[in-house]
Swiss-Prot record:
It is found in: Secreted. Heterodimer of a B chain and an A chain linked by two disulfide bonds. One of its GO terms (cellular component) is extracellular region. Residues 53-81 form a propeptide. Disulfide bonds join C29-C93, C41-C106, C92-C97. This is Insulin-like peptide 5. Ligand of InR/insulin-like receptor. It comes from Drosophila melanogaster (Fruit fly). Expressed at a high level in seven cells of each larval brain hemisphere that may correspond to neurosecretory cells. Expressed at a moderate level in the larval gut. Keywords: Cleavage on pair of basic residues, Disulfide bond, Secreted, Signal.
Amino acid sequence: MMFRSVIPVLLFLIPLLLSAQAANSLRACGPALMDMLRVACPNGFNSMFAKRGTLGLFDYEDHLADLDSSESHHMNSLSSIRRDFRGVVDSCCRKSCSFSTLRAYCDS
């Protein structure tokens, strides 16, 4: 008997939870992404290729640091200098982002 009363409650709550999650996620590409940035950033926004807190042009992440020395010499020597650029397109077009993530691209 209790099972029958739980089903309608679940059928009511699941769409609410999904819509709340969807409301917190934005996803747009091309001109729509530019329009979202213009709305979120009235004082302008940073380059599409740079976000606060990411690596600079000459910075790198050493992806070989976790490997043993016997493994690392087999790897391509250039693989340790992999620049990890993440822009607004990566954050809000290829996957969804929150409004606060979108605001991180705004000029101060």
